[in-house]
């Protein structure tokens, strides 16, 4: 049992250190050697845990998204908030996390461009990584309609509507290099109010 715990602990340490390398170097310039150096281990040891840098990157992103999902689920289960407040708080929480991880978002964009150049569909990767988030948004919307707090509309349309704010936030932070999302926050709050009864 102790060996498994040590293995998992070391794996998490590698992922945490790999994120630092990816943020400093970008996906294309990050190497197994740089990750090993950041971890303070031999490169050959990395191969005991991961087969290549793409696998490390994917697990690093997955770990980060799990953290985001935990934050969102805690908002979702907060009984003191109505549906409008929950959706607003979730979007604002996501905006804050995006602002805090601006550099990582640039690396993710770099990675998606890299995949596209390799002939791999970035859309499939993004969809797989965001399906839980979209499900959470959909379930919050369904709950709000069921409770008579939100207007009736197609769930997919509502989900796309809310998710478009997340995409806009990423675009503003990474592509247009906005300092913060204050204007988008105001727009999102206004838009969510329009969904309320």
Residue ranges of predicted features:
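N-terminal intrinsically disordered/low-complexity leader segments
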Residues: 1-9
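Helix-turn-helix
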Residues: 2, 13, 21-55, 59
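An amphipathic alpha-helix adjacent to DNA-recognition modules
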Residues: 8-16, 28-29, 49-73, 88, ...
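Hydrophobic alpha-helical connector segments
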Residues: 59, 73-102, 158-162, 185
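Amphipathic alpha-helical packing segments from all-alpha helical-bundle domains
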Residues: 69, 73, 120-147, 157-160
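Short secondary-structure transition hinges
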Residues: 96-138
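Hydrophobic/aromatic-rich alpha-helical bundle segments in the mid-to-C-terminal region
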Residues: 103-110, 123, 127, 145-191
């Amino acid at each position: 049992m102790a060996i498994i715990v040590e293995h998992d602990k070391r794996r998490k340490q590698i992922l945490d250190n790999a994120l630092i390398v990816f943020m400093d170097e970008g996906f294309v310039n990050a190497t197994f050697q740089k990750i090993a150096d950041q971890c303070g281990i031999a490169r050959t040891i990395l191969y005991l845990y991961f087969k290549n840098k793409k696998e490390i990157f994917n697990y690093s992103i997955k770990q980060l998204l799990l953290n985001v999902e935990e934050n969102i689920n805690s908002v979702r289960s907060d009984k003191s908030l109505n549906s409008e407040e929950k959706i607003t708080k979730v979007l604002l929480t996501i905006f804050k996390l995006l602002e805090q991880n601006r550099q990582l978002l640039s690396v993710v964009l770099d990675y998606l461009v890299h995949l596209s150049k390799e002939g791999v569909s970035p859309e499939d990767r993004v969809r797989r990584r965001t399906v839980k988030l979209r499900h959470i948004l959909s379930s919050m919307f369904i709950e709000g309609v069921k409770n008579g707090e939100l207007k009736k509309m197609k769930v997919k349309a509502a989900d796309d509507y809310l998710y478009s704010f997340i995409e806009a936030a990423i675009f503003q932070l990474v592509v247009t290099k906005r300092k913060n999302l204050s204007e988008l926050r105001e727009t999102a709050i206004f838009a969510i109010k329009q969904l309320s009864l």
